[in-house]
Swiss-Prot record:
Manner of cofactor binding, per the entry note: Binds 3 Zn(2+) ions.
Ligand binding (Zn(2+) 2): 145, 179, 214, 259
Native species: Bacillus subtilis (strain 168)
GO MF annotation list: deoxyribonuclease IV (phage-T4-induced) activity; DNA binding; DNA-(apurinic or apyrimidinic site) endonuclease activity; phosphoric diester hydrolase activity; zinc ion binding
Catalytic activities: Endonucleolytic cleavage to 5'-phosphooligonucleotide end-products
Designated name of the protein: Probable endonuclease 4
Annotated binding of Zn(2+) 3, by residue: 182, 227, 229
NCBIfam families: nfo, PRK01060.1-1
GO BP term, example: base-excision repair
Record's function text: Endonuclease IV plays a role in DNA repair. It cleaves phosphodiester bonds at apurinic or apyrimidinic (AP) sites, generating a 3'-hydroxyl group and a 5'-terminal sugar phosphate.
Pfam families: AP_endonuc_2
Length: 297
């Protein structure tokens, strides 16, 4: 079954219910949320997330699997500032609790940035952090995201992710979130040889680790190490390559999440592209008038 959705907002008083309603309005059967603003630690209590009503709405609409994304402020790769590392460890622990309470099985995490100490030192610190965070009995896997390699990001190569996974004691609690834009920007040829890239991933990490896919086009050429998402079919990856990933036999049951940009020049009135992009990917047919249609909604 094709599981496809997008990032949606969990906010206001309806919280999880609002997120599910937004996803359904896009024709989605899965979705991804942050449990609060990704750039700060302010969070509502678990009992204020409106979980029961949200889960009921999900069930009514055939949504059985959702994803949580950890906030960007978590950086367990930071070797220079102990307080940043400790905040990351503590906050990731509490986010895992919230993820479990919501009923999600995967929390996507940017592995971390070494902030100048070098990739080896950063990876060592990430392993230390994950070993501190992980409870072997937790019901949530941490999905390490494939990164573009912007700045001092760790996890831009499959080898770096494998190194992290191998260093973690209870690595059965680790999975991978494969991001098409990041992988392309890191230098992998997913446009012309996605099967080759997937085979390489399988040899180095194991395809069974992939539990989430982020489906994004890229504003940049392969290997640019920039990480700037583009709407589906309007970037350097292109529609054909992305729809090949979405419908790939080896990835068919994995949730595919769009994180493409809102459309429009007016910053206060940008339009979400997800209903249109999801439909286009389901139909396997590129629509070059898509951006105009998004603006007219």
């Amino acid at each position: 079954m094709l599981r496809i959705g997008s990032h949606v907002s969990m906010s206001g008083k309806h919280m999880l219910l609002a997120a599910s309603q937004e996803a359904v309005s896009y024709g989605a059967n899965t979705f991804m949320i942050y449990t609060g603003a990704p750039q700060n630690t302010r969070r509502k209590k678990i009992e204020d997330l409106n979980i029961e009503a949200g889960r009921a709405h999900m069930q009514e609409n055939g949504i059985d699997e959702i994803i949580v994304h950890a906030p960007y402020i978590i950086n367990i790769g930071n070797t220079t500032n102990p307080s940043t590392f400790e905040l990351g460890v503590d906050f990731l622990r509490s986010e895992i609790e919230r993820t479990a309470a919501i009923g999600a099985k995967q929390i996507v995490l940017h592995p971390g940035a070494h902030v100048g100490a070098g990739a080896e030192a950063g990876i060592k610190k990430i392993i230390e952090g994950l070993n501190e965070v992980i409870d072997p009995n937790q019901n949530v896997q941490i999905a390490l995201e494939t990164m573009a390699g912007k700045g001092s990001e760790c996890g831009r190569s499959f080898e770096e992710l494998a190194q992290i996974i191998e260093g973690v004691t209870h690595n059965e609690q680790l999975s991978v979130c494969f991001d098409t834009c990041h992988t392309h920007d890191a230098g992998y040829n997913i446009v012309e040889d996605f099967d080759g890239v997937l085979n390489e991933f399988d040899k180095i990490i194991g395809i069974d680790r992939i539990k989430v896919l982020h489906i994004n086009d890229s504003k940049n050429v392969k290997g640019a190490r920039k990480d700037r998402h583009e709407n589906i079919g309007f970037g350097e990856i292109g529609f054909d390559a992305l729809q090949y990933v979405v419908h790939h036999e080896q990835l068919k049951d994995i949730p595919k999440i769009l994180e493409t940009p809102y459309v429009g020049e007016d910053k206060k009135n940008k339009k979400p592209p997800y209903r249109f992009e999801i439909e286009m990917l389901k139909e396997k047919q590129f629509d070059d008038t898509l951006l105009e249609k998004i603006l007219q909604q």
